[in-house]
Amino acid sequence: TIISSTNYSKSINKSPVRLQKSTGNCLYQERILLYMNYDSVPLRDFKELNDWETVIFVYQSALKQVETKIDILNGEFQHRHKYNPIEHVKSRIKTPESIIKKLKRHGYESSIENMVRYVNDIAGIRISCSFTSDIYLIADMISKQNDLTILARRDYMKNPKKSGYRSYHMLVTTPVFLSDSIIDTKVEIQIRTVAQDFWATLEHKMHYKFEGDGPDYITKELRECARYVAELDTRMEELNNEIQKYGKLSDKK
């Protein structure tokens, strides 16, 4: 049976899969309950906590699968070309607080069905690379994986956000094989240079510090810094190309 992510909550209700309550899962449940009590979100909106637990388990499994795939692709590239396009890979599962806030911000009730349908970045992977050309190289390698389905792409490299944010986003689904079913699960992949990642981390902190409404002078300064980062990436790319040309000429001698 192949289950679409849009019918996720229905399939999980029917699934006999249940996780043993480990310390980590108990802490996760406590965070959900604490936040729900604090924000007056009724418990009935989440159905059973066991369902939530199973959903998170499936997203964690999807994250592991995509991470492993990226690691293999990077290793293969090193094996064939003696070069690693990927510098760092980070992954995370969105916290219950963030999921609930995002649903409320977009006017949706806090339910498992809405969570799965409308929150595309519950499972997220961030890939940092040295050069802008690596971004498209990595995106191309990921796109060629037959067991991944590309749902959407957003090229903020060519079309930066107003804030100055630059990155390349891919929304994919990967099949998670359970004992009695296959669940197509969404994972968001962000690819950017190390310099862009440094800038984005600072911008992200400011966004949440000021709840998206920071002082004008800070916003302006960040936008200016984003321009410098873009210029730096361009110069480093050009310098790398010159180094590669020099290396090829040296090999011929």
Predicted features, each with a name:
Residues 65-80, 86-97:
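Small/polar-rich, solvent-exposed N-terminal microdomains that initiate assembly or binding
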Residues 116, 129-238:
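Long beta-strand-rich cores associated with HINT superfamily self-processing modules
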Residues 4-5, 9-11, 15, 22:
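Serine residues within intrinsically disordered or low-complexity segments
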Residues 84-122:
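A glycine-rich, hydrophobic loop/mini-helix early in the fold
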Residues 35-76, 188-253:
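An acidic, glycine-/histidine-flanked metal-binding catalytic module
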Residues 43-50, 79-82, 115-124:
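A short, surface-exposed helix-loop junction/capping segment
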